[in-house]
Amino acid sequence: MSQHQKIYPVQDPEAATARPTAPLVPRGSSRSEHGDPSKVPLNQRPQRFVPLAPPKKRRSCCCRCFCYTFCFLLLLVVAVGASIGILYLVFKPKLPDYSIDRLQLTRFALNQDSSLTTAFNVTITAKNPNEKIGIYYEDGSKITVWYMEHQLSNGSLPKFYQGHENTTVIYVEMTGQTQNASGLRTTLEEQQQRTGNIPLRIRVNQPVRVKFGKLKLFEVRFLVRCGVFVDSLATNNVIKIQSSSCKFRLRL
């Protein structure tokens, strides 16, 4: 009896340990050995994503500096406004009143170089109607007399203090010289013959310091504008003032 030899296949040990060099799924395919990634397994719930609040931005130094400056200025404005309101309620300020009472022309001469020399004496009445406010009239004032666009004379007011509810009469001498005034005298004469009066303007720029009780404030300026109609400009005669009106304005 012949013996049959059985041959069993033997696995190659190198082939058992070798890994495939090619992917199980072709390239470009969305499937792999883990299944379809686009499908969520039935036993796995989808995760909920809670949006996180963005982190707070830190204020820069410039922003803080701007805020502090703005708050300081706001408080300063409120404090100044409150102080002014308190002063107004306590002292009840009233505007001073001014009037031109007398005007005299002492010189009105046309020179050979066509310049006009003039000299005026003006009497001004200043009234302070306030009960608790005094006015210091400081140096550096200026008063001028004008006819249309021509300045005829100029001068200055004296330095003095005007007390409460006080009326002060101020006497001012003014002189001036107008260049190229050959036709100015003729124009004044024609104005007088045509209308019977001559319109003049008197301007006052006066630095003052106001005193509230015992508190003396910083310097401000009184601006006074007076329109005066006179009958003539006769030399060495008191000019008759037909009408006059003055306006007052305060400038810081």
UniProtKB/Swiss-Prot annotation:
Transmembrane regions listed in the UniProt entry: 70-90
Gene Ontology BP terms: abscisic acid-activated signaling pathway; defense response to other organism; positive regulation of abscisic acid biosynthetic process; response to abscisic acid; response to osmotic stress; response to salt
Domain of life: Eukaryota
Protein name stated in the entry: NDR1/HIN1-like protein 6
Pfam families linked to this entry: LEA_2 (PF03168)
Disulphide connectivity of cysteines: none
Glycosylation sites: 121, 154, 166, 180
Gene encoding the protein: NHL6
Entry GO CC: cytosol; plasma membrane
Entry annotated with the keyword Isomerase: no
